[in-house]
Amino acid sequence: SSLAMKDGDFLTNNDIFEKDGLAGTVNNFGDINAFKGGAIALIAPQVSNQGNISSSEGSSLLLSGDKVKLTLNGNKLIHYSVEKGTIDSLVENDLAINAGDGVIILSANGLAEVSQSVVKNSGTLQADSILKKGGKIYLSARDGNILNEGIIDTSSVQGSGGEIEITADEISIKPDSQILATGDSGGGQILIGGSWQNSDPDVYQATRTLVEEGVKIDASAISNGDGGEVVIWSDIHDRKSLTQVYGKISAKGGRNFGNGGRIETSGSRLNIKNIFVDSSSPFGTHGEWLIDPYNITITSSGNAKHAVTGSSPNLTWTANADSSEIDVNDIITALSSSNITISTDGVGNGSQDGDIIVSAPLTSSSTNRLTLDAHRHITINSQINLAGPISLEGDDVILNANIISGSNPSNTDLSYIIGKLSGSSGFSQDTAFLSVQASGDSTY
């Protein structure tokens, strides 16, 4: 560490490091190895690793701040906290950090009113495992930026995948990045920008999250067990938030048994053109893909309604319109391997009411379920023809084009409509398993 330690803290084994006057940087160009289960911590306002760091079954930490506290039990890390931010806070890894079966933490804490913090990984972060569950990797830059163009891996050869959490105000996952939490006996968990439907308040919510084309994110089970969980999120209640996902996202079930996992891509504004999503299972139940912006229109183009300027990691997203769009072909492709839920929120700081509009024909031979769950209205302006079941939930369901569901005779799953039904067209369920629950007057 380039931070100071008070004599009293040293004598009482209090690992508190604090800037006292000037503090230099910490740069590693060599090899640093800890005994099994031990801890390695590089602490300074600016920290850079251009060498190799290894702490098998232990902890490797790169921490940026003006005051940092570690809690150790012997050589084992129990807790850490960056208690005071710093100007030009920077943590970067350019080569390799390995903590097999252990924990890797890259954390930068800036002074928000002066400068943002930055965490950059262009190398390899590996907390994988052979026999056990994969380890844990955390990248954190609250009120700052995270840029990843390397490999982050908590996979397990025989166990289940581990945990990866990437949290910052702005997150950019560059082409050719790999973020992996696969496991032979079950998939792990990958959280980028938030938790599932913001269910964990301890996971910091991003304002802007970008996953570029050519990125691989995988929380699949390999042989046995269920697929894991992948969340790519920005705060859906913040009108400025934007989530862009163009990469390949997987949470597949095991090839021998197990169900598919679940994938969420959400943001107040959302663009997912040409995304590839797979939560399938060869022998179990297919998993789920949840899409949750404010208003959304299903179109034949899925054009982005925003501009991106600047250079990584300092990107600027500027929305040109409120509504999000999704290309109907991306839905059709994903239905082949996943149940899909498109949900709108329509509450909080956003300017819209949470409508879903279908403006392009949607035809699929898959027997997986499509769910449209609107905070307010669902408007069907183009025909939907599905082999599988469909669920429509909203205050009003307006049918200006026909819906055909269950055209595959082998499918007997229930389709349902919840909401006041109106419009000039109708709903056909080939196998006659249709439930309509309406409040108020309905015309159909």
Pin down the residues of each PLM region.
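Extracellular and secretory-pathway beta-repeat/beta-biased strand scaffolds
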Residues: 1-444
